Amino acid sequence: MRLFKEKLAWAAPLAVIAIIALFSVNLFAQGNPQVRNLPVALIVNDEGANVDAVSSAVQQMSKGIDGEEPMLAFTIERESDIEDLFHDKKYYAALVIPEGYNDAVQHALENNSPAALQVYINQGYNITGANAAKAALNGLIGQLSNKYSEEFKAQLGDQKIDTDQAAVLVNPIVSQEK
Protein backbone atom coordinates (compact mmCIF):
# COMPACT_ATOMS: atom_id res chain seq x y z
CA MET A 1 0.00 0.00 0.00
CA ARG A 2 2.81 2.32 0.75
CA LEU A 3 4.17 1.81 -2.82
CA PHE A 4 0.98 3.24 -4.36
CA LYS A 5 1.13 6.33 -2.17
CA GLU A 6 4.67 7.31 -3.14
CA LYS A 7 4.72 9.68 -6.11
CA LEU A 8 8.35 9.00 -6.95
CA ALA A 9 7.66 5.29 -7.49
CA TRP A 10 5.16 6.19 -10.26
CA ALA A 11 7.36 8.85 -11.85
CA ALA A 12 10.11 6.49 -13.04
CA PRO A 13 7.87 4.10 -15.06
CA LEU A 14 5.93 7.05 -16.52
CA ALA A 15 9.18 8.75 -17.56
CA VAL A 16 10.37 5.54 -19.25
CA ILE A 17 7.06 5.20 -21.13
CA ALA A 18 7.22 8.86 -22.22
CA ILE A 19 10.79 8.49 -23.49
CA ILE A 20 9.94 5.31 -25.42
CA ALA A 21 6.90 7.01 -26.95
CA LEU A 22 8.97 10.01 -27.97
CA PHE A 23 11.60 7.87 -29.71
CA SER A 24 9.01 5.70 -31.46
CA VAL A 25 7.23 8.75 -32.86
CA ASN A 26 10.58 10.08 -34.08
CA LEU A 27 11.48 6.77 -35.75
CA PHE A 28 8.01 6.49 -37.28
CA ALA A 29 8.37 9.93 -38.86
CA GLN A 30 11.71 8.93 -40.41
CA GLY A 31 10.43 5.57 -41.62
CA ASN A 32 11.07 6.05 -45.33
CA PRO A 33 13.17 9.11 -46.13
CA GLN A 34 13.09 10.13 -49.79
CA VAL A 35 15.96 11.84 -51.53
CA ARG A 36 14.70 14.75 -53.62
CA ASN A 37 16.30 17.53 -55.68
CA LEU A 38 19.94 16.80 -54.89
CA PRO A 39 21.94 19.47 -56.74
CA VAL A 40 24.18 17.90 -59.38
CA ALA A 41 26.34 19.74 -61.92
CA LEU A 42 26.23 18.73 -65.59
CA ILE A 43 29.42 19.58 -67.44
CA VAL A 44 29.34 19.24 -71.24
CA ASN A 45 32.72 19.40 -72.98
CA ASP A 46 31.73 17.82 -76.31
CA GLU A 47 29.09 18.00 -79.03
CA GLY A 48 27.26 15.47 -81.16
CA ALA A 49 24.34 13.06 -81.28
CA ASN A 50 25.66 10.87 -78.47
CA VAL A 51 26.12 13.91 -76.24
CA ASP A 52 22.53 14.91 -77.02
CA ALA A 53 21.43 11.41 -75.96
CA VAL A 54 23.09 11.91 -72.56
CA SER A 55 21.51 15.36 -72.25
CA SER A 56 18.05 14.01 -73.05
CA ALA A 57 18.51 11.19 -70.51
CA VAL A 58 19.48 13.82 -67.93
CA GLN A 59 16.37 15.85 -68.81
CA GLN A 60 14.19 12.74 -68.40
CA MET A 61 15.77 12.09 -65.01
CA SER A 62 15.16 15.71 -64.01
CA LYS A 63 11.41 15.44 -64.59
CA GLY A 64 10.67 12.99 -61.81
CA ILE A 65 8.17 10.14 -61.84
CA ASP A 66 4.39 10.52 -61.58
CA GLY A 67 4.57 14.23 -60.85
CA GLU A 68 6.89 13.78 -57.87
CA GLU A 69 10.00 15.87 -57.45
CA PRO A 70 13.06 14.37 -59.15
CA MET A 71 15.87 12.75 -57.20
CA LEU A 72 18.52 14.92 -58.89
CA ALA A 73 18.37 18.56 -59.97
CA PHE A 74 20.89 19.20 -62.74
CA THR A 75 22.53 22.55 -63.49
CA ILE A 76 24.98 23.14 -66.34
CA GLU A 77 28.38 24.34 -65.11
CA ARG A 78 31.98 24.63 -66.36
CA GLU A 79 34.56 22.03 -65.38
CA SER A 80 37.05 24.70 -64.35
CA ASP A 81 34.62 25.90 -61.65
CA ILE A 82 33.76 22.51 -60.14
CA GLU A 83 36.42 22.51 -57.40
CA ASP A 84 35.21 25.86 -56.07
CA LEU A 85 31.57 24.80 -56.33
CA PHE A 86 32.31 21.60 -54.41
CA HIS A 87 34.24 23.59 -51.81
CA ASP A 88 31.28 25.97 -51.43
CA LYS A 89 28.99 22.92 -51.05
CA LYS A 90 26.79 23.83 -54.00
CA TYR A 91 26.71 20.30 -55.51
CA TYR A 92 26.76 16.72 -54.28
CA ALA A 93 28.19 15.43 -57.55
CA ALA A 94 28.94 16.30 -61.16
CA LEU A 95 28.40 14.38 -64.38
CA VAL A 96 31.07 15.28 -66.94
CA ILE A 97 30.76 14.54 -70.64
CA PRO A 98 34.44 14.71 -71.61
CA GLU A 99 35.84 16.03 -74.85
CA GLY A 100 35.92 13.23 -77.44
CA TYR A 101 33.00 11.33 -75.88
CA ASN A 102 30.90 11.44 -79.06
CA ASP A 103 33.72 9.92 -81.15
CA ALA A 104 34.51 7.37 -78.44
CA VAL A 105 30.92 6.08 -78.53
CA GLN A 106 30.79 6.01 -82.33
CA HIS A 107 34.06 4.08 -82.59
CA ALA A 108 33.82 1.97 -79.42
CA LEU A 109 33.65 -1.36 -81.25
CA GLU A 110 36.38 -0.41 -83.73
CA ASN A 111 38.74 0.80 -81.00
CA ASN A 112 37.84 -2.03 -78.59
CA SER A 113 37.50 0.46 -75.76
CA PRO A 114 34.35 1.76 -74.09
CA ALA A 115 33.47 5.44 -73.94
CA ALA A 116 33.71 7.01 -70.49
CA LEU A 117 31.53 9.47 -68.64
CA GLN A 118 33.16 11.04 -65.61
CA VAL A 119 31.42 11.28 -62.24
CA TYR A 120 32.83 13.66 -59.63
CA ILE A 121 31.63 13.04 -56.08
CA ASN A 122 31.69 15.68 -53.32
CA GLN A 123 32.15 13.49 -50.22
CA GLY A 124 32.82 16.58 -48.12
CA TYR A 125 29.30 17.94 -48.53
CA ASN A 126 27.19 15.13 -47.08
CA ILE A 127 28.25 11.52 -47.46
CA THR A 128 24.69 10.18 -47.59
CA GLY A 129 23.63 12.66 -50.25
CA ALA A 130 26.86 12.13 -52.20
CA ASN A 131 26.36 8.36 -52.18
CA ALA A 132 22.74 8.76 -53.31
CA ALA A 133 23.84 11.05 -56.16
CA LYS A 134 26.62 8.62 -57.09
CA ALA A 135 24.21 5.69 -57.21
CA ALA A 136 21.72 7.65 -59.33
CA LEU A 137 24.40 8.82 -61.78
CA ASN A 138 25.83 5.30 -62.09
CA GLY A 139 22.30 4.06 -62.75
CA LEU A 140 21.89 6.68 -65.49
CA ILE A 141 25.19 5.63 -67.06
CA GLY A 142 24.12 1.98 -66.84
CA GLN A 143 20.87 2.76 -68.67
CA LEU A 144 22.76 4.61 -71.41
CA SER A 145 25.21 1.72 -71.69
CA ASN A 146 22.36 -0.79 -72.08
CA LYS A 147 20.76 1.38 -74.77
CA TYR A 148 23.97 1.56 -76.79
CA SER A 149 24.64 -2.13 -76.21
CA GLU A 150 21.31 -2.99 -77.85
CA GLU A 151 22.06 -0.64 -80.76
CA PHE A 152 25.50 -2.18 -81.30
CA LYS A 153 24.04 -5.70 -81.20
CA ALA A 154 21.53 -4.72 -83.87
CA GLN A 155 24.30 -3.19 -86.02
CA LEU A 156 26.51 -6.26 -85.78
CA GLY A 157 23.79 -8.76 -86.59
CA ASP A 158 25.40 -12.18 -87.06
CA GLN A 159 28.99 -10.96 -87.40
CA LYS A 160 31.65 -12.74 -85.41
CA ILE A 161 33.48 -10.63 -82.85
CA ASP A 162 36.53 -11.16 -80.66
CA THR A 163 36.55 -11.07 -76.86
CA ASP A 164 37.63 -7.42 -76.67
CA GLN A 165 34.71 -6.38 -78.86
CA ALA A 166 32.39 -8.56 -76.79
CA ALA A 167 33.49 -6.75 -73.63
CA VAL A 168 32.75 -3.40 -75.27
CA LEU A 169 29.47 -4.73 -76.65
CA VAL A 170 28.31 -5.66 -73.16
CA ASN A 171 29.41 -2.37 -71.59
CA PRO A 172 29.96 0.35 -74.22
CA ILE A 173 29.85 3.22 -71.70
CA VAL A 174 31.65 3.14 -68.37
CA SER A 175 31.77 5.46 -65.39
CA GLN A 176 35.04 7.00 -64.24
CA GLU A 177 34.77 8.29 -60.69
CA LYS A 178 36.92 11.13 -59.45
Name each region found by the language model:
Residues 2-178:
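Extracytoplasmic/periplasmic domains immediately adjacent to an N-terminal transmembrane anchor
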